[in-house]
Amino acid sequence: MHAVLWSVGEPGREIPMSAQENKDLVRREQEELWNHTGELDAAEKLFAAAQAEAAKQQAADFRRGFPDVVSTIEDLIAEGDKVAAHWRSRATHQGDYMGIAPSGKEVEFTGISFYRIEGGKIAESWTVEDQFGLMRQIGAIPEPGRSEEASPT
């Protein structure tokens, strides 16, 4: 008895990636694009053509202000073509960021990003991060109950 097994798909139709492959792609995005040791050109191999330049520019803008950034993934969940990532970044404010001069302060903040994967690349992404906390840590937003000027005691 012989058994022959093969897979036939519709012409032009892509075989969906597995949940693990999608999670691995998101891990690579964090390591290869967002961490200070990564290359900005990694965006071209990680993102769909329509998204690559915007992703590269966002990473460049952030890394200009925080050149030593290290991002770690705390949790990843994948279902179908979607991946959710909870991540944490640590860095030192060493360059201009959103018009704010370098403070030299170390920061730590978290975020959650959602991705849609298509054809082995990130087709869309949405991120919610603690920008308020980040701005407070670099001194752009005063701590509650503290004025900008020192009050005499």
Name the predicted role of every residue range.
Residues 2-153:
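C-terminal and inter-domain tail/linker signature
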